[in-house]
Amino acid sequence: MYGNYRPGEYIVVDLKHMPKSIHGDEYLCVFTCLSTRLSESVYLKTRLASEFLDHYKNYCKHIRNKTGNYPKYLHSDNGKEFIEKCTSEFNKQKGIKHTYTSPHSSLQNPVAERINRTLGEGCLALLLCAGLPLMFWVYGIAFFSFVKARSPHKSLSFSNPIAAWNIYNTHRSSIDLYDLRIFGAEGYVLDENSLKNHPKAFRCIYLGPSSTHKGCNFYNLHTKKVIVSRNFVINEQCFPGRVHFPNIYDKYFGPSPPKPNSESISPSLSTTTDANGLEYSSIFDFDSHTIPTSTNLP
């Protein structure tokens, strides 16, 4: 734990501007519990204090329900969304002591700044490898946060934030990795409304486990919308984003190697004779498979 504070009592927060997402969000706000290093990311469309306050209130309620504790300290920079009157009044009403960094001194909030940078770099790596544009950063952040919360942490004696959080969690839940696959992989989602003798699945891009449903998020390549489903099959050897958004992947990793063109491969004709003196003419394709074409009897 961080000092003598119990989980949820000491919170640091930081807000970061991001490119416009597929849902119109432009800001990433990360709340971090210093005792467990467990982070929760929320997405904002503006920097208005009212929008931040709504997410802040929900986070405080979440901590109260999960741990039985209520935040005692909040540490942030001097962003206008943090120092507005409505935020200050809420902190006074709940007895939360809000401390700020000095102007232009982000080093005074090291945990929040480090986590924001880690999430940003991890999200960028996921998007580039999957060949997806930056408008999918919301799902990249959520996926990376999901993995990070279940990975060993040095400050927790190499335990993970979820395990440290569950020690004081009144509603404990085991770590479930059942829906975890490679980000950006090809997925086929069951079409619940398919007709007889019609395709039974949509070809999609896997975007990680859903935080609000018991299922996973997928980007439908046909409708260009994000859907949630629990009935799917994942092909982790294929990444449709590299083809669907070729400029993204090719810019950083170079063009993908060309696929073999079957039309440019000319099969060779070979004649063989068996022990009985019968001649067989066979076509050899590029995979070295033989297809008998004719038989010449004596």
Residue ranges and their predicted role:
Residues A112-S159, N169-R172, D176, R203-I205, ...:
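Charged alpha-helix within mobile-element recombinases
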Residues S76-N78, F82-F90, H98-G122, M135-S145:
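RNase H-like two-metal-ion nuclease catalytic core shared by retroviral integrases
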Residues M1-K45, S50-F52, Y56, K85, ...:
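An active-site-proximal beta-strand-loop segment
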Residues K16-M18, L34-R37, A49, G79-E81, ...:
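Conserved beta-strand elements of beta-rich interaction domains across eukaryotes
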Residues G24-E26, V42-K45, C86-E89, S102-P103, ...:
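Short coil/turn segments at secondary-structure boundaries
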Residues N69-K72, M135, S155-N166, I175-Y188, ...:
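Retroelement integrase C-terminal DNA-binding domain
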Residues R6-I11, D25-V30, S35-E40, T67-K72, ...:
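Core residues of folded domains in eukaryotic genome-function proteins
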Residues S41-T67, I227, F232-P240:
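Active-site beta-loop-alpha junctions of metal-dependent nucleic acid enzymes
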